Amino acid sequence: MFKVIKKQGRARRGQFQCAHGGMVQTPVFMNVGTQAAIKGGIDAFDLRDQLGCQIELSNTYHLHLRPGDETVKALGGLHKFMRWDGPILTDSGGFQVFSLASLRKIKEEGVTFASHLDGHRIFMGPEESMRIQSNLGSDIAMAFDECVENPAPYDYAKASCERTLRWLERCKAEHDRLNSLPDTVNPQQMLFGINQGAVFHDVRVKHMQQIAKIDCDGFAIGGLAVGEPTEVMYEIIDAVEPYMPADKPRYLMGVGTPSNIIEGVARGVDFFDCVMPARNARHGKLFTWQGTMNIKNAQYKLDDGPIDPQCDCPVCRKFSRAYLRHLFTAQEMLGMRLAVMHNLYFYNKLTERIRQALDADEFDAFRAEYSRKLAEKV
């Protein structure tokens, strides 16, 4: 299922087999299509044919509310619904539920919260999250967990991790049951557990040791990139990584910048996701191999060159900086679409180049050249 084929330091070059789309090459960036679509007018055919996407990520909470997971199941599952034949990971809905701080109530059974759409009350617990994700038919389901706010009191973070551990045990039991049903959409669906613990190293390590005993198909580090300093995030990864099973994929949830990805790989992480490339693109902020740029700046008004001379994406091959700036200035929808295409291609190409560097035993040199450079402004 998952195999590490090469290492350089803690950085891992691997392969991961999914029910859809064949072998995933890792490290990998997962393109975030929250509601079975990437904001900016990007469809499954763009992802597959033009942007180099290996895995798409969709959101359990949003799809449960609209169009409804039962609807998606009736239409053959998420792959058929969005016409994507590659792997899909669905998050558990936990992050969205717990971000509704003023609208939810936590109990041992699960969480009662108000829909952000119309305010009606919804209950979601481990079993409900597993059933929704089973209906969606994703390749990878994420366990239902509590993502505590930052900063969080030590005692609360500790108690929350104990509850999240119990929830993972319930997720595992329900997930196994659902996969055995004759009418399940994807009987090969996998389950990843999630490490929590806020910024407290001892809580994080103990929780990782506990969840590693449960037979999950992979493990994630959650609850980061929520306001803590970048160095604190790296320190937490350093603390937790030694206790993550070496034979299972490791996923750093919601992270991050290109530099974060390079540094995450250096610390033994295999999977990444983030809304940043698409979100930034919709505001004219683009990633290049020279650093970040704001295409709306006046300096690009007469610039006939590509966004990035070192990029071979469909946008850089065809359009100029001046044209893209004009589209944003004129508020044309095409501007957002082209910008999102470029940024997603860049992120997918970044992880491809990381894999190539690992294959060639040149990751340390790649990291030294690009980790700081990609964070600079052009």
Where are these regions (language model features)?
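Short, well-ordered coil loops that connect the C-terminus of an alpha-helix to the N-terminus
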Residues: 53, 84, 138, 216-217, ...
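C-terminal extensions of enzymes
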Residues: 1-15, 24-31, 40-41, 145-151, ...
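Glycine- and acidic
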Residues: 150-153, 158, 218-224, 333-336
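A non-catalytic, amphipathic alpha-helix used as a structural packing/dimerization or gating element
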Residues: 128, 132, 136, 159-170, ...
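Structural signal for hydrophobic packing residues in well-ordered secondary-structure cores
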Residues: 137, 168, 172-175, 179, ...
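Conserved, mostly hydrophobic/aromatic
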Residues: 22, 56, 91, 133, ...
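Glycine-rich phosphate/ribose-binding loops and adjacent secondary-structure elements
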Residues: 162-165, 174, 178, 186, ...
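Non-catalytic, usually N-terminal nucleic-acid engagement modules in DNA/RNA processing proteins
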Residues: 1-185, 298-301
